[in-house]
């Protein structure tokens, strides 16, 4: 294991920010700590980075050197790319050679004399990553790396950062409030709410097999509370899913018929609220339909 945490808690006065956190991260794994504002995710990251002390902890063990990549990259705007990276190598005897290796590895050799405000967001991310790993870290901590970015840039930077992390064979922990970031980047997701970990699973397990508490908070999930006739094939499937299923688990087909109650245009999809017998639920479809129209649908077998 790269990181193991057992029974970690953190209090700020009478406020308990983290409660009995148990977490493990394997070497080479990418873990996202997912949660909303006030969930405790940033506090947990700061404790792992040793920027904050836990109020109590049975043990916290990290196998290798830790580096942190901050939300705004924390690059020095008055220094050029080369000097930003050299800042992390101030006490290294072979810092010139390490610098050359990093510039080549991250494909930023042509940027070495440019200042930070002269390069793109993607290039700045590469520089920040190069500086973070300059001292030979084994565990990289990422603090909301994609917040405040437009959607196109965010998608590009996610792909780029994931590729770089895999290439460097580094273990990474990212805190984020954006579930799309977590689904896209992660091997595992720890879902944090009000200082407690509600779920620790791979992205598909979290979406397709969430527990009830997680499903109440996670987006794009239907929770069915009505009594169902389990002789009905669709209702039997819902029961097999513990009465929780995703909007994207249904498609147009010929097995079941529902009536459209509401629709919202989301760009690539329409979010439809439909009624089937005695239950209402949501589904995502690419085609447009009219209100009160009947549609035939089926279950997607993932």
Give, region by region, the residue ranges found by the protein language model.
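ABC ATPase nucleotide-binding domain helices that frame the ATP-binding cleft
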Residues: 42-45, 127
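ABC ATPase nucleotide-binding domains
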Residues: 67, 80-206, 210
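Short beta-strand immediately N-terminal to the Walker A/P-loop
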Residues: 31-32, 68
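Non-catalytic connector elements of ABC transporters
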Residues: 231-302
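The feature captures the beta-strand-to-loop junction immediately N-terminal to the Walker
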Residues: 34-36
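Helix-to-loop junction immediately C-terminal to a conserved catalytic motif
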Residues: 49
């Amino acid at each position: 294991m790269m990181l193991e945490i057992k029974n970690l808690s953190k209090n700020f006065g009478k406020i308990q920010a983290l409660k009995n956190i148990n977490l493990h991260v394997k070497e080479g794994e990418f873990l996202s700590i997912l949660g909303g504002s006030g969930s405790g995710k940033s506090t947990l990251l700061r404790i792992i980075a040793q920027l904050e002390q836990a109020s109590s902890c049975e043990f916290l063990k990290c196998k290798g050197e830790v580096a942190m990549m901050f939300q705004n990259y924390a690059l020095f705007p008055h220094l050029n790319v080369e000097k930003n990276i050299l800042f992390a190598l101030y006490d290294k005897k072979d810092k010139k050679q390490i610098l050359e290796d990093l510039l080549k590895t991250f494909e930023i050799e042509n940027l070495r004399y440019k200042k930070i405000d002269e390069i793109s967001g993607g290039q700045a991310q590469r520089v920040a990553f190069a500086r973070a790993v300059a001292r030979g870290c084994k565990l990289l901590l990422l603090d909301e790396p994609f917040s405040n970015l437009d959607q196109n840039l965010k998608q590009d930077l996610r792909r780029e950062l994931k590729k770089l992390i895999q290439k460097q064979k580094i273990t990474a922990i990212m805190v984020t409030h954006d579930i799309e970031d977590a689904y896209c980047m992660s091997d595992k997701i720890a879902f944090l709410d009000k200082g407690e970990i509600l779920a620790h699973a791979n992205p598909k397990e979290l979406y397709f097999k969430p527990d009830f508490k997680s499903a109440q908070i996670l987006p794009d999930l239907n929770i069915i509370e009505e009594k169902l006739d389990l002789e009905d094939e669709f209702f039997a499937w819902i029961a097999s899913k513990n009465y929780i299923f995703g909007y994207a688990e249904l498609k147009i087909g010929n097995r079941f018929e529902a009536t459209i109650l509401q629709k919202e245009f989301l760009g690539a999809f329409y979010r439809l609220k439909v009624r089937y017998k005695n239950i209402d639920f949501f589904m995502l479809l690419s085609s447009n339909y009219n209100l009160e129209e009947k549609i035939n649908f089926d279950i997607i077998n993932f």
